[in-house]
Amino acid sequence: MAISFRTLALLTLSVLLISISLGVVTATESQRNEGEVLTMYEQWLVENGKNYNGLGEKERRFKIFKDNLKRIEEHNSDPNRSYERGLNKFSDLTADEFQASYLGGKMEKKSLSDVAERYQYKEGDVLPDEVDWRERGAVVPRVKRQGECGSCWAFAATGAVEGINQITTGELVSLSEQELIDCDRGNDNFGCAGGGAVWAFEFIKENGGIVSDEVYGYTGEDTAACKAIEMKTTRVVTINGHEVVPVNDEMSLKKAVAYQPISVMISAANMSDYKSGVYKGACSNLWGDHNVLIVGYGTSSDEGDYWLIRNSWGPEWGEGGYLRLQRNFHEPTGKCAVAVAPVYPIKSNSSSHLLSPSVFKLVVLFVFQLISLALL
């Protein structure tokens, strides 16, 4: 039976009105009133141990908190999002305040002159589909906190050294970031004012090693008063130097991570409220501002390929202190510039834990031949 024009028009109008009504309800429900937000804020203050003493400071921070909450909820309402944002200890900070206190990565192009072919990806290389150095015992379980100090470079450096030391010796030792902050002043590292993992590796080599954080604990303060001379006999970990992964090449970076944790710089200014998922959000793909440690990679069935990154903002941030960042990006620099400045420490026999791809292929062929002969 044919539908009249009048009937069709009424049906269309009804659907439109229902859609508008649903939209109004959804919008109303998503908009919190001032009292609800204030209750959330008071609870957040308790959970994060915040206490403001300055006149009007609590009110000023509340306004910032509201703005950040709005940004979080607007992002999380997008059905096509690849990651979640959430409230955390940074939720009362402006973007400028966050960047000034928690970023600190510095890297001059001259420091990338030590590019090595050790992890240059070659056609035919066989690499694992996924890697997680936490499962192999090469990552200190406790996610560390840099605090309000731009010392991310020190944490990325110690994490990489902790990893290669465990891979080479079988011993996992948590190392001292504070020694680097206090004592590594000869290059372009400036304590809480920022620095780079490359120069930290140089310092550790030239200094004859680095002590554990049990001996030289972290304070997060930029005193420049080096206490390491008193601990000369307690050095526990040494390295032979450092090298740079071929830059702007995610396949070479993947190969490097298959061998050991790698220190990189990423553009992290927009990641203060990252909570979970594979980050595909806004960032610079040209140059980084924050040092972190890649400890693995993998593929999510929902969000695709990712890098597994250990941060130094404590376990309350992100996925227990970790970030999953989009991998196999369409630009050679990688997502958020992850492939621009990848560096790693080297230690005697540091490559002995994993067969080279070419040798691995020969071993696989040999095993298959043995199996074939056994079945004859």
UniProtKB/Swiss-Prot annotation:
- A single GO BP: root hair elongation
| Domain of life, per lineage | Eukaryota
Protein's name in the database: Probable cysteine protease RDL3
Q: Please state the span of the N-terminal signal peptide per the UniProt entry.
A: 1-27
Active-site residues annotated for this sequence: 152, 290, 311
Q: Which residues are glycosylated?
A: 80, 270, 349
Q: Say what happens when this gene is deleted.
A: Decreased root hair length under phosphate deficiency.
Enumerate the propeptide ranges: 28-126
Per the similarity annotation, which family is this?
Belongs to the peptidase C1 family.
A GO term, aspect molecular function? cysteine-type peptidase activity
- Using the UniProt record, name the top-level EC class of this enzyme in a single word: hydrolase
* Cited InterPro entries: Papain-like_cys_pep_sf, Pept_asp_AS, Pept_cys_AS, Peptidase_C1A, Peptidase_C1A_C, Peptidase_C1A_papain-like, Prot_inhib_I29
Functional description taken from the UniProt entry: Probable thiol protease.
- Alphabetically list the UniProt keywords: Disulfide bond, Glycoprotein, Hydrolase, Protease, Signal, Thiol protease, Zymogen
The catalytic activity of this protein is classed by the Enzyme Commission as 3.4.22.-
SUPFAM superfamilies, alphabetically? Cysteine proteinases (SSF54001)
SMART domains named in the record = Inhibitor_I29 (SM00848), Pept_C1 (SM00645)
Pfam family of this protein, just one? Peptidase_C1
Q: In which tissues is it expressed?
A: Expressed in root hairs.
Q: Which cysteines bridge via disulfide bonds?
A: 149-192, 183-226, 283-336
